[in-house]
């Protein structure tokens, strides 16, 4: 991986990340392709939208169709025909959240499949083996995620395990690269610690001392804590993260969350929000959210957003989308998802331009002014 900082403004960073499959300009939002596809869209749609990197989910792909099958097709790129970069998470979050009785121990996580109830065990090495099969460009390590709020003792245990597993993972990755496995794949560690400054500092320092990691993520946020608490935690944590490596905030979030955390030095984001909200009738626009289900749009000839240049806005009216949603037409999911993802990707493009022009404050102010009208 190549990484360079192209410019900064008010704490916000514009960077370039080069992987084996694409050049990624930051700040970057990564659409979530849980099953190897962004819901309702295919590889061509994502290319038309200009996506340079999307997320794949190790837990789901491990269970179905299985990483060995995907490997036969040349990894995720060959299987999905999306030629640009993939980031795959470790699957730890899904093992934690989807299994009724997941049990972490010192060596990994035992969980039951949400599909058929079969028992499985993730370890720092096994999740990397799965990601080697997937041939993703950026692999996330297994981390010990805890629900918030929680006891100090449990959060301390989470940090200790995550650090231990990170060391196991990076050692294993270096060994595998010596064998010619995963030579072009990059590996990120995940900082934990809840919303405690003391714990976040401890986790960040322990992980960031492991210099062989290609980047670092902030995990365990956007799980119900107030927004201001999330922003404070990110601002506190980034100061302990290296400036010369990518910074990734996992599972975040709303357009406002992205703007606030870009200002706090974050480079990379992912969230299911644009596609999930699209399917539920909520569309993102330059002036805020629009609920296409409302009767007021039944005969509205305007596009979703007059300032938007996406395929949906260039071709279809609010009235048509209102009709498709009410009729439960599958086409609605595609057109709405195209719009919402375009909105997110374009917001990141505008943010980058503002950073490079060193007028972040003006950009951020205008972002909020338009949404308050």
UniProtKB/Swiss-Prot annotation:
Mention one GO molecular function.
metal ion binding
* Cofactor annotation: Zn(2+)
Which residues are annotated as active site? Answer: 89, 270
Enzyme class (EC, first level): transferase
Q: Which GO terms describe its cellular component?
A: cytosol
Give the SUPFAM superfamilies listed for this entry: tRNA-guanine transglycosylase (SSF51713)
Task: Give me the residues that bind substrate, please.
Answer: 89-93, 143, 192, 220
Entry keyword Membrane: no
Q: Cite the cofactor comment.
A: Binds 1 zinc ion per subunit.
Reactions performed catalytically: 7-aminomethyl-7-carbaguanine + guanosine(34) in tRNA = 7-aminomethyl-7-carbaguanosine(34) in tRNA + guanine
Q: Which Pfam families match?
A: TGT
Is Nucleotidyltransferase tagged as a keyword? no
Residues of the region (RNA binding) are 251-257, 275-279
InterPro entries per the UniProt record, alphabetical? TGT, TGT-like_sf, tRNA_ribo_trans-like
What does the subunit comment say? Homodimer. Within each dimer, one monomer is responsible for RNA recognition and catalysis, while the other monomer binds to the replacement base PreQ1.
Q: Which family does it belong to?
A: Belongs to the queuine tRNA-ribosyltransferase family.
Q: What does this protein do?
A: Catalyzes the base-exchange of a guanine (G) residue with the queuine precursor 7-aminomethyl-7-deazaguanine (PreQ1) at position 34 (anticodon wobble position) in tRNAs with GU(N) anticodons (tRNA-Asp, -Asn, -His and -Tyr). Catalysis occurs through a double-displacement mechanism. The nucleophile active site attacks the C1' of nucleotide 34 to detach the guanine base from the RNA, forming a covalent enzyme-RNA intermediate. The proton acceptor active site deprotonates the incoming PreQ1, allowing a nucleophilic attack on the C1' of the ribose to form the product.
Q: What is this protein called?
A: Queuine tRNA-ribosyltransferase
| Species of the source | Aliarcobacter butzleri (strain RM4018) (Arcobacter butzleri)
Which lineage ranks, top first, belong to the organism behind this chain?
A: Bacteria, Pseudomonadati, Campylobacterota, Epsilonproteobacteria, Campylobacterales
Query: Its encoding gene is what?
Result: tgt
């Amino acid at each position: 991986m190549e990484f360079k900082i192209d410019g900064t403004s008010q704490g916000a960073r514009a960077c370039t990340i080069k992987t084996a499959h694409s050049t990624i300009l930051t700040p970057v939002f990564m659409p979530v392709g849980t099953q190897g596809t962004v819901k309702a869209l295919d590889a061509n749609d994502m290319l038309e939208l200009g996506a340079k990197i999307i997320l794949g989910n190790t837990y789901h792909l491990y269970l179905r169709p299985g990483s060995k099958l995907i490997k036969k097709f040349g990894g995720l790129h060959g299987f999905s025909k999306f030629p640009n970069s993939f980031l795959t998470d470790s699957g730890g979050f899904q093992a934690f959240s989807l299994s009724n009785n997941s049990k972490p121990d010192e060596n990994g996580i035992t969980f039951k499949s949400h599909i058929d109830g079969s028992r499985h065990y993730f370890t720092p090495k096994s999740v990397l083996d799965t990601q080697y099969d997937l041939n993703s460009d950026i692999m996330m390590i297994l981390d010990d995620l805890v629900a918030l709020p929680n006891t100090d003792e449990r959060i301390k245990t989470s940090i200790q395990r995550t650090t231990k597993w990170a060391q196991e993972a990076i050692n294993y990755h270096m060994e595998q690269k010596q064998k010619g496995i995963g030579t072009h794949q990059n590996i990120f560690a995940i900082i934990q610690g809840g919303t405690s400054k003391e714990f976040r500092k401890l986790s960040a320092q322990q992980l960031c001392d492991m210099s062989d990691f290609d980047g670092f993520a902030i995990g365990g946020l956007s799980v119900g804590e107030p927004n201001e608490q999330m922003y404070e935690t990110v601002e506190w944590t980034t100061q302990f993260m290296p400036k010369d490596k990518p910074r990734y905030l996992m599972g975040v979030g709303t357009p406002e969350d992205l703007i606030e955390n870009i200002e706090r030095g974050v480079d990379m984001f992912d969230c299911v929000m644009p596609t999930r909200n699209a399917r539920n009738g909520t569309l993102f626009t330059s002036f805020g959210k629009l609920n296409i289900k409302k009767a007021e749009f039944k005969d509205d000839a305007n596009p979703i957003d007059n300032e938007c240049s996406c395929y949906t806005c260039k071709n279809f009216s609010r009235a048509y989308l209102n009709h498709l949603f009410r009729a439960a037409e599958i086409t609605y999911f595609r057109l709405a998802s195209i719009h919402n993802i375009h909105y997110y990707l374009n917001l990141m493009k505008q943010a980058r331009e503002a950073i490079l022009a060193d007028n972040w404050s003006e950009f951020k102010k205008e972002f909020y002014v338009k949404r308050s009208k």
